Swiss-Prot record:
Gene transcribed to yield this protein: rpl23
Protein name in the entry: Large ribosomal subunit protein uL23
PANTHER family to which the protein is assigned, alphabetical: 60S RIBOSOMAL PROTEIN L23A
Family, per entry: Belongs to the universal ribosomal protein uL23 family.
Species this chain originates from: Aeropyrum pernix (strain ATCC 700893 / DSM 11879 / JCM 9820 / NBRC 100138 / K1)
UniProtKB keywords: Ribonucleoprotein, Ribosomal protein, RNA-binding, rRNA-binding
Length: 86
């Protein structure tokens, strides 16, 4: 799966904004078929950062969310600003 096909959009709520600031974590809506490795590879290639950890879940509404924790040397807030999420 191509990196640009994996991520559908950035997911922004009060909770994800707090996670962005306190835990250095970005939240995305991704394709249901995407694996954690697909998400990690896509974020690293598209945004030029190093990913430490990816957690995924499928919501009751049927879409898949990915919580992507960046390595300490990168700031999630900088990436979110580039994306226009903050």
């Amino acid at each position: 799966m191509k990196p640009e096909e994996v991520i559908i959009r950035v997911y922004v709520t009060e909770k994800t904004t707090r996670m962005l600031e306190e835990e250095n974590t970005l939240t995305f809506i991704v394709r249901r078929e995407a694996t954690k490795n697909d998400v990690k590879r896509a974020v690293e290639q598209l945004f030029g950062v190093k990913v430490e950890k990816v957690r995924t879940l499928i919501t009751p509404r049927g879409y898949k969310k990915a919580y992507v924790k960046l390595a300490p040397e990168y700031k999630a807030l900088d990436v979110a600003t580039k994306l226009g999420a903050v």
